[in-house]
């Protein structure tokens, strides 16, 4: 199924846990004190891990063949200070754009831009993650 531009996933909670922030910072080999302590802030790419917390079926389905799926680009925009430990955000995906381009080895590559909005408990938009997904062209002869 190819969900249209504007299609949305189901909202899910993102609990910003201090320990998870510290684990993420350690994985980045960061010693920045902003990522430690009770009021730790999230590193800029921390929200990527929220995809792992989404319940099954909550993420918007762009309908691409996972055997030919590439993650082309990722961008984060913060609308104010970064989230802090103890916050509970509500996340929801939406398809912002779809387009096609000819593949360099033939066939057509399909693209989908998915924006994940992260909102504070009062509904304020805190951050957005913008991801460009690419479905490569099928190989000649129909093999994935």
Task: Indicate residue ranges for each PLM-predicted region.
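Hot-dog-fold acyl-thioester-processing enzymes
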Residues: 1-73, 142-144
């Amino acid at each position: 199924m190819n969900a249209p531009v504007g299609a949305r996933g189901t909202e899910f909670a993102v609990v910003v846990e201090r320990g998870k922030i510290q684990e993420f910072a350690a994985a980045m080999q960061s010693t920045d004190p902003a990522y430690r302590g009770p009021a730790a802030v999230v590193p800029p790419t921390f929200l990527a891990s929220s995809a792992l917390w989404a319940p099954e079926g909550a993420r918007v389905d762009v309908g691409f063949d996972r055997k030919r799926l590439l993650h082309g680009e990722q961008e984060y925009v913060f609308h104010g200070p970064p989230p802090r430990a103890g916050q509970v955000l509500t996340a929801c995906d939406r398809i912002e754009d779809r387009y096609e381009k000819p593949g360099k080895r033939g066939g057509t590559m399909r693209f989908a831009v998915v924006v994940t909005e992260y909102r504070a408990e009062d509904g304020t938009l805190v951050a957005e993650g913008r991801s460009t997904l690419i479905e490569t062209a099928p190989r000649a002869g129909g093999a994935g």
